[in-house]
Structure formats: structure tokens, C-alpha cells
Amino acid sequence: MPVPRSAKISMSASPYKQLEQEFKRLHAFRGALALLRWDAAVMMPRGSADVRGEQLAALETEHHALLTAPRIIRLLDRAQANTQGLADWQIANLREMRRQRDHAIATPVTLVSRLTKAASRAEARWLEARAQGKFEAFVPYLEEVVHLVRDKAALLGQALNLAPYDALVDEFSPGLTTADIDAMFKALSRRLPALIREAIIAQEGRPFLPLNGKFPAGKQRALVVEVMKAVGFQFDRGRLDESEHPFTEGVPGDLRVTTRFDPDDVFTGLLGALHETGHAMYDLGLPQEWRDQPVGRDRGMALEESQSLLIEMMVCRSRPFVRYVQPLIARHFGTSGPEWEVENVYGHLTRVQRGLIRVDADELTYPLHIMLRYELEKQLLSGELAVRDLREAWNAGMEQRLGIRPSNDLEGCLQDIHWAGGSFGYFPSYALGAVIAAQLYESMRAELAGLDEQLARGEFSGLFGWLRTHVHGLGAKVPVQELLKSATGKPLSAASFVRYVEAKYLETTASSAAA
């Protein structure tokens, strides 16, 4: 764990200490930007999108100007020329400072401002297009974002000596490239299609009862808050709200989690909130001593998504968790009867079906949703696919991969906000996250005796203690591959994920009873 900065060698006038102060200011800007984005999705009137875009652009421009100032590069050069006396965390912090600066300097401030404003407009129009159910209303706004992201990718790639799309991936998942992504998808493609068929056939032999009931949003919120508190979310340093698309925003010490409630399905809101709580617990577990420095941030979105998917999919869709949450649901909603017995609820949560909506997809079909988005966003950025043709390409891709076709745009190309916000290169982090989560979970289960019994009692301290030691507490100190080798003994591999889903969905081993 990091040594307290106050206990280190005094360097009050050193280049390194001056850099710490500069990046502390930048951290404050990040927090302000995060809260403005949260407010835009949760509280802001839709007609205020242009005003909010101006506010975001002003702060982004100032953040960019601070990060790319000549003073920063001079201090970085001087600090990295003489690292004698610096601790390993400080040296890693310098590396992350340089990385942030290199990414920022590659993108002109005018492009940063234009993209921020365009993304703010596009996100607002995405909401309107969803309300109308018409992709056409969104097309010109997405076209503008794609054009600007294409320019950004070209500049980033040139500066970082990466292919344009790899440069975008590197922003979200540092150190990972399309080569890693393609290798992962190749391994998954060899097994998943057949496994999906096998799992569907297997579950046909054990039909389950529908989970009928009415679940008022107020009572759902009370349930979600109770479970989030048990998991360890600190409501004095964060809050829960509703939004069109669940997300987590903010900085450690001020985290905002959202979910969406379905009056006919208690698990939509619960699992959505717990997915986001996985993100929040990662952020809360980051090294407090470095929370305002680059090295104290998460190690990228692939690792971030591994934490959310580990909680939502592997922990919360397990028999031990069902044993814990079943009586809570009964207490909040008065549910009873055979449909609410543990095995039936577990069958509901692990049902495999070829569905249209990514956020509602099961573990087996989920990677196929990501493969589609990965291919489409690469084609959009390369110019191979025009935005106006996205709907048909999406629908054809769904039919090819899952054998189903959207009947409307809400089931298809309007279901995700990521591209509206300019987050191209993000989607692969979901599949990478699932693979990383399985790798970590396999090692965790081998080391933690009695984990299932703890989860069944609603005790999560052992699970998060392991994650804090092997993931959260490391911040951005080491690359993802090094972290995985240390935690699991091997680099990124899809093998653990395949073993996990085979055991869980085909019940191929005795240990799968704990799944």
C-alpha cells in the first residue's frame, strides 16, 4: 500500500511537488465536470442542453489548457530527469501525469470544445429521439460527433504512434489494443454460439415460473438502498438517483449512482444499481492518499467494467446471493409462493435467451452484443459505414449474431448513449471486463474459503477485502496485464470466462451448485 505522502522526503520546491499541486487542481476540474454531466442526465431540463454544453465546454477547455501548458511539460521533463529519492508510487504518478499530458496535447483545444458541445447536443437529441422512437431525428447530431471523433482519433493515433481506433481504446483501456480485443473475441466466438444453444436446451428441461408481482418504485428504491448499504456503498459520500440509462459519475468522495426501475420486474432496478455499485466500490476503494493524483485513479474502463460485472453477474446472479436477497424482497413487497423459492429465482436470473437489449442480456449472449457494437463503431469511424445506414447495419448484425431482429429503434440503434457522448472505443471494455472479472473471480474463490456462506448472509467484506488488495488499492500504479498476473498468475485470457459459464450454465461440475 502507498506510503503517506506526508511521510516522504520533503521536496516543497521540487518539480515533482509542483506537479502534484497542478494535478490536484486538474482533479478538482474533473469533479466539477462529473457533477455537471450527472446533473444533465438526472436533473437538468431538456431545453437546457445548449446552456449545459457551453458550461461543459468552458470547463473542458480550461482543463485542457492547464494540462497542456508549457509549464507542465517543463516540470515533467525536469522531474523525470531526476527521480532519485522518489518512491515507487511517485514514479508511477509521474508516468500517469505524462500519459495524461500526451493524450491532451494531441488534441487541439478547439477540437475539445467542439466535441464537448456536439456531444452535449447529441445526448439531448438522443433522449428526444428515444421518446419519439425515431432514429432519423438523431442522425445529424450523431454525424457531427462521428466526424469530430474521427478527427480526434487521427490526431491521437499520430501522437501516440497507434492506429486511430487503438488510440481511442487506449483512452479507456490503457495498454490494451485491438489485437487483445480480437484475440478475446476469437476465443469467445469459438465456444459461445454452441454454448448458448446448449444452455437453452438444458434450461428447457427445467422450466421456471414467472416472477409475477407489482413493484412500486419507492419500495424498489428502499430495497436497493438496503442492499447497497450491505455491499458497502457509503451514502454519506454518494447518492442514488434514477436516469434513462444507469451510470456512475463523480469522483471518490462524491459518487453518483443511477438506475432505472421497472414496475413489473424488481431485478431491473436492483441489478442495474448493483452493477453501478460495483463501479462505485472500485472508486471508493482507490488509494485515498492518492485520490487527487493520476496514479490514484482507476486503471481504465476494462478494469472498471470487470468490477461492475463481477458484482452484477457473478455475485448477484448466484444461489448464495439469491438466498440473501429473497427474504428482503418478501419483506419489501410481500412476495410468496413457489415462484419466489430460491431455485426458481435463480433460474430466472440465469435464464439464457437471445434478447435485443444489451443491458438486459445474460452472460452468454452479452459478448455478442459487444461484438456488434465493436464492429459497427470501427466502421463508422473508418467511413465504411455512414450514420444514416446504421439502423440497417445494426439490425442485420443482430440477426446474424443472435438470430433476432429489432422491431423498432429503441430495441436497436437507439438503446445506448455511448456514441452520442463521443465514447467510441468504450464498448470493448465491457467484454474485456467480463473476461477479467471471471479471471479475478476464479482466483478469489480459490483463496477465500467460505465465500458462498458469507454472501448468503449478506456479508461482502471478504469479497471486497480481496478486491481492495488485488485491484482497488493499486489505483493506476501498474498496467492491467501486470495486475492480472499478480492477482491470478496469468495474463488476460478468455479461458477462465469459458470455464465459468460452462460450469454455471451447463452445471458441468459439482462446484457449480455454488454458482
Residue ranges and their predicted role:
Residues 115-266, 505:
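Contiguous, non-catalytic segments that form substrate-binding/exosite surfaces or channel walls
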Residues 19, 157, 261, 265-288, ...:
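Active-site recognition of the HExxH zinc-binding catalytic motif
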Residues 4-174, 477, 502-515:
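A well-structured
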Residues 236, 289-293, 317-327, 387-388:
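Acidic/polar loop patches that form or flank catalytic/metal-binding clefts of enzymes
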Residues 5, 9-15, 34-37, 41, ...:
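C-terminal, non-catalytic "cap/extension" segments appended to globular domains
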Residues 297-338:
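Post-HExxH zinc-binding segment in Zn-dependent metallohydrolases
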Residues 51, 111-114, 141-144, 184, ...:
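Secondary-structure capping and boundary motifs in well-ordered enzyme cores
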Residues 185, 189-192, 217-221, 227-241, ...:
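All-alpha helical catalytic cores of prenyl diphosphate-utilizing isoprenoid enzymes
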